[in-house]
């Protein structure tokens, strides 16, 4: 089982009303939430941990998790409000207005941490849930508690507009990355850290600081996976891009699902992946249609919502004409 640990929120996506007026409609979202949903819909045993509100928005989140076969029993259900994000899309790129003060997700503490059984093989962390207090400290404490015995995956998913104290957040990401087995960065994430060197040098930096597998996504140029012994670069797949909301989150699910499906989700095996296993990890074009179509379909629908329902509906094996950007 893979436990995804991080934010769940309601994305208010722009919609036109029946009268032609501008409005918004609620959809379940959040970076780590999206990864959990993708894993569950791929048939990977998945659980999710965060704080979820006992309100109508929280019901949307829980119903979506249940429908995607994600176990939400580790979640802390509280009377605090839900996090709401109003989304503006410009040329497929999203900007957000967040309402997060005192919310169920933000206010979790170490008292809310779940007990984990032997069936939990890996934990996945990242994104904006690592920024504020007290939830940022809470997720870091969970990683510290479990890092010695389970695979740890981290996607910093840097959002500079939400980070008010860059040195503090950078220090947290560095501490967590040093204890993580898998670390995924976008090229924009790496720019934020301000380190010098090309991607090969930057991957070596993070490997030398503790990571066993580093994956770097490069938009239309594809992705590269690194261990201390080898590097594999995989080109991107051509799709029709509607927007990129949740694309990186789905990519994270693809990495974890690939390792799980190939029985490689242990600390020792992640550290010693052969070339084919390394290629499978960052490759959105997995040899199984069911695996490789997930990130491609994600790019072809609007928002991080009903995209994966198309896995069973779409049997066309031929990719569309635009470029997939992880």
Swiss-Prot record:
Name listed for the protein in its UniProt record: Fructokinase
Enzyme Commission numbers on file: 2.7.1.4
UniProt feature, compositional bias: Basic and acidic residues: 307-326
CDD domains associated with the record: bac_FRK (cd01167)
Superkingdom per UniProt: Bacteria
SUPFAM superfamilies: Ribokinase-like (SSF53613)
Compositional bias annotation for Basic residues: 287-299
Native source species: Rhizobium leguminosarum bv. trifolii
Residues covered by region (Disordered): 275-326
Reactions mediated catalytically: D-fructose + ATP = D-fructose 6-phosphate + ADP + H(+)
Top enzyme category: transferase
GO molecular function, one term: fructokinase activity
InterPro entries: Carboh/pur_kinase_PfkB_CS, PfkB_Carbo_kinase, PfkB_dom, Ribokinase-like
The family this protein is said to belong to: Belongs to the carbohydrate kinase PfkB family.
Keywords attached to this entry: ATP-binding, Carbohydrate metabolism, Kinase, Nucleotide-binding, Transferase
Entries under Pfam families matching the protein: PfkB (PF00294)
């Amino acid at each position: 089982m893979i436990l995804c640990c991080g934010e769940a929120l309601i994305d208010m996506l722009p919609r036109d009303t029946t009268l032609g007026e501008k409005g918004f409609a609620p959809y379940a979202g959040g970076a780590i939430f999206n990864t959990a949903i993708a894993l569950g819909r791929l048939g990977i045993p998945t659980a999710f941990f965060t704080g979820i509100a006992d309100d109508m928005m929280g019901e949307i989140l829980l119903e979506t998790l249940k429908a995607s076969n994600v176990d939400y029993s580790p979640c802390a259900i509280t009377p605090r409000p839900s996090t709401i994000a109003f989304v503006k899309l410009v040329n497929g790129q999203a900007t957000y207005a967040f309402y997060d003060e005192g919310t169920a997700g933000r206010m979790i503490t170490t008292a809310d941490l779940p007990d984990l059984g032997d069936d939990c093989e890996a934990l996945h962390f990242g994104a904006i849930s690592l920024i504020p207090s007290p939830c940022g400290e809470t997720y870091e404490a969970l990683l510290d508690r479990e890092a010695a015995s389970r695979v740890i995956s981290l996607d910093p998913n840097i959002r500079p507009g939400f980070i008010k104290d860059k040195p503090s957040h950078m220090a947290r990401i560095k501490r967590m990355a040093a204890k993580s087995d898998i670390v995924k960065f976008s090229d924009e994430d790496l720019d934020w850290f301000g380190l010098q060197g090309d991607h090969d040098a930057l991957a070596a930096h993070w490997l030398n600081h503790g990571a066993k597998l580093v994956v770097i996504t490069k938009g239309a140029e594809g992705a590269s996976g690194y261990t201390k012994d080898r590097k594999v670069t995989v080109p991107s797949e051509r799709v029709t891009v509607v927007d990129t909301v949740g694309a990186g989150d789905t990519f994270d699910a693809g990495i974890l699902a690939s390792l799980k499906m190939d029985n490689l989700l242990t600390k020792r095996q992640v550290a010693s992946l052969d070339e084919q296993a390394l290629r499978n990890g960052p490759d959105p074009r997995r040899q199984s249609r069911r695996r490789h179509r997930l990130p491609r379909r994600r790019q072809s629908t609007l928002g991080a919502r009903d995209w994966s329902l198309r896995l069973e509906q779409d049997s066309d094996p031929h990719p569309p004409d635009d470029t997939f950007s992880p």
